[in-house]
Amino acid sequence: MKFGSYRRPSALLSTLLAFATLVTVCSTDECFAASARRKVVIDQDAFGPAGSNLQAILMLLQSPDVEVLGITIPSGDGWRDEEVSHTLRLLEIAQRTEVPVHPGAVLPLLNTQSRTKVWERLYGKLFYKGAWTEVWPAEGAVRRTPYHADPYLVPPSPAGEPRIKPAHESAASFLSRKVREFPGQVTIVAAGPLTNLAMASRLDPEFASLARELVFMGGSFNPVAADNGFAAEYANAPRREFNMRWDPEAASIVLHEPWKKITEVPIDPTTRTFFKPEFIQEVARGQAPFAAYLGRFGQSFPMWDELAVAVWLDPSIVTRSTALLVDVDTSFTAGYGDTLSWSIGEGPGLGERPVTVVFDVDVPKFERMSLDLLKAPTPAH
């Protein structure tokens, strides 16, 4: 166009120019959440009913700016198939049956119950062994079905049996497919053992590099027991945490993968959180379709997995974090499964990745955020 023939742009052209400007601005990380709902795959050992595992899933389902692409399930707190059943029933109650559930690893990569018993004879009893826990303390333990060694047995649930079915595609395949479908956009929020992620990494060497980031709950550094009776076991084993101890080899594999960003929420900040009885009563009075479910099955425990979810949803709740190199001890010694860490630049140089480790959070802000999400009506999706 000649300069002399310049005219005011049409309304359509103005709209197109405005849209182009919006796209340019919102292509940055700062505007990513404003331009589209954040995509997430939840990897969770979803034992239930209710409890920290499933309440963490509910928080993500209740977040209006989050698109839950699917849920992948490994064994951990319970056996995979029982956890899958709890998750499917939760989705029915929450009226979110469009979210697919993909069964993952039944067993750790290398660790076994028999190996764990040998380890205990050598080095002492483990406080908690998830699906391998045969005898529970009389007080202070989560309400759950009796111990069973059959990983494929699904006992009846007091919350009812699901009518919907899990997806046929494996967890590892689904994880790989989603990061390739949305390269650089999918966050993996993992709140159980990392077996599924390790399998995805071995199935697809580009899996981690194609994800947006990894946020995981697990590991332990030097937690301080609170006055609620939890975390006392860390006085003697401050670096031993269940998610890493269930499958140390998987955790080590995942922590060496080329993620763009890794955020770890260890046990340390969770000891100051607690899902109080009054919280259960408050969410039971809420408008969510699962209000009665949480009112009936909710239990008062530290908010382990909810905190990992909240850190991703709103990083402003973090008041202290440190960048460290992190790994997990895979030697079959007294430290098997323990968290290893070094300051940046001081690691052994075997491919350790920098991890942002969260040590302190604004607990009242976190609690209010969690309750608001769990009380709200189901968002449009």
Name each region found by the language model.
Residues 1-8:
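N-terminal secretory signal peptides that target proteins for export/translocation
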Residues 11-27:
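Bacterial N-terminal signal peptides
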Residues 24-36:
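Bacterial Sec-dependent signal peptides at the C-terminal "C-region" and cleavage site
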Residues 36-38, 55-68, 235-236, 242-381:
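Conformational coupling and interaction surfaces
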Residues 78-86, 109-110, 220-224, 327-345:
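Short, mixed-charge aromatic SLiMs
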Residues 118-137:
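A charged helix-plus-loop insertion that forms the helical arch/lid used to bind
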